[in-house]
Structures are given as structure tokens and as C-alpha cells.
């Protein structure tokens, strides 16, 4: 395995604890830098192999918006599950960390860019890597991508954030695998803007 491929796979193991724990007071900016680094490496290694879209732009957008609506509904239901389980404080902690010192005018484009870069790495390049390197997950690379995305969020020490990552990972990974990451990017960006800026749940 080449050094750059090793870096490509292992870097989130460093960046996620650094972003969510060490630099949580400037979380949104640290997250932006982290995912930009991952996206640059992804495009450098697998940019030509990433499945961007296999549909018309209208269909890609439609699929992306439907995916965002599904995600938002799942999170709406999930919030009430956290209340029943008595862990809803984990939700407010996530919002507090996201809002931080970032004004809305900065937060909106920053969240969009984070969503784009995350999809390039987690649902784009990572699925390419899994298809090329894994025998077990070769035909279901979205499963490996969703698993890694969920598990990496255990490092945040927030069970709600871990559960949220599992849901986001599964939905966007399936969309990217079937329709391309243009649709999963739209899903991610529309959903995150809705749940953080326009229609927050449990903030």
C-alpha cells in the first residue's frame, strides 16, 4: 500500500478526535479544514474514478432533495427517541458545538462546503477504494463506507452524534452508490442546512 493511500484511509482517525474533542471550541472551522484536507487527497488519488452522477441534472437534484427529506424525517423521529431514552442533551450539545462563534452568514456556506467535502471523501473516493481493494465489500462498498463513517464518530464520545452519523452514513452511502455523489452531496447539503439553520430539531 502506498503511503498516500495509507494516509487516505487513516487520516480521519486523527482528524475526527482532533476536531470534535481537542478543537471543539472552534469546531466548525476545524471541521472545515479537516474535510477540505480529505477532499483534496481524495481528488488527488481517485478524482477520475469517483462516480459523480449517472442521471440527468434534474433527476440528480430530485433524488438529492428526496434523500434530504428522508434524512430530516428520520432525525425528527430520532429526536423523540432521544427524549424517551433520556439522552436528548446530546442533541443540544451538538448544536452548541456547531453554532460556536460562527455567525449565520458564515455558518451557512461553511456547512455547505463541509457537506460537499465529506461526500467527496466518504461517499466518493472511499467507495472507489473499497471496490478496488476489498474482496468482501467489493460489491457493497457503501456498507463499508457507512460503517467507517459511523464508527469514526465514536471518537466524539457522544452517543447521539454516533447514531446520527450511522443514519447519515447509510442514507448518503446508498444514494451515492446508486445514483452518484452529486445526489448525495445535494442530500447532505440540503439536510444539514435545514436541520442546523432553517428548521433545527431540539436545539
Tell where the protein language model's regions lie, with residue ranges:
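Transmembrane helix-loop-helix hairpins at the membrane interface
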Residues: 104-203
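Juxtamembrane membrane-interface segments at transmembrane alpha-helix termini
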Residues: 21-22, 41-51, 73, 100, ...
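Residue-level signature of transmembrane alpha-helical entry/exit and packing/kink sites
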Residues: 4-9, 31-32, 56-64, 103-107, ...
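Alpha-helical transmembrane segments of polytopic integral membrane proteins
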Residues: 39, 43, 47, 75-78, ...
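Juxtamembrane helix-loop-helix connectors linking adjacent transmembrane helices
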Residues: 49-114
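Non-cytosolic membrane-interface motifs at loop->transmembrane helix junctions
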Residues: 27-31, 89-97, 162-170
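Alpha-helical transmembrane segments of multipass membrane proteins
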Residues: 12-16, 37-38, 67-75, 191, ...
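Alpha-helical transmembrane segments in multi-pass membrane proteins
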Residues: 1-47
